[in-house]
Amino acid sequence: MERITFWNNKGGTGKTSLAFQTICQYAHENPSEKILVIDVCPQANLSELLLGGLHQGGSNILLQRQGATPRATIGGYFQLRLPSPYTPPSFTAQDFLTQPYKYNKNIPENIDLLCGDPMLELQANAISTLANNQIPGTNTWIAIIDWIF
């Protein structure tokens, strides 16, 4: 499985635009491959863009996904993982995914999205603490990183 990451701690560098264009182009060129986009940004700009952007109500669609049960975002996924962080979940990650093409006809059908969420700001400290706990017989860092991988 190939992984591509866009990251820069500085805002305004073009991460969202570059990621959006790369994802869509790759999806068009490789229609038989499934692409999972994980938006790990509390601002969720990439999610909004994939869901329709400014002109097609991407922000409102994202709010709907955040209001779903379960909350169909990475924050919703983490919210259910936090109470039992070191054990396998009783739910499936599929419950949190969104198919952007259902909301934005310009997005290829082979793209799935785990939407960004403002809750990540609040969850970051808890997740960091859990990853750094010292529990005999448990590699807590791997257990937490495994939530995504």
PLM region descriptions:
Residues 1-149:
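P-loop NTP-binding core
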